[in-house]
Swiss-Prot record:
This is UPF0391 membrane protein Mbur_2216. The chain crosses the membrane at residues 1-21, 31-51. It comes from Methanococcoides burtonii (strain DSM 6242 / NBRC 107633 / OCM 468 / ACE-M). Keywords: Cell membrane, Membrane, Transmembrane, Transmembrane helix. The keyword Transmembrane applies. It is found in: Cell membrane. It comes from the Archaea. Coiled coil: none annotated. It is a multi-pass membrane protein.
Length: 51
């Protein structure tokens, strides 16, 4: 699961850099991907804790 949170952080950083450089479409897409990866990570972490 560490890889999943790592990917989310990478996409978050990519989105912030793209936003600063003015590529708003790329930034929005990267933020969406990062958001879903964080949600998946949290769900999997909760399932792991419960099992």
């Amino acid at each position: 699961m560490a890889d999943l949170i790592g990917l989310a952080i990478v996409f978050l950083i990519f989105a912030l850099v793209a936003y600063v450089l003015g590529a708003r479409g790329v930034a929005g897409l990267s933020m969406t991907i990062a958001k879903w990866l964080v949600i998946i990570f949290i769900v999997l972490a909760i399932i792991t804790i419960l099992l």
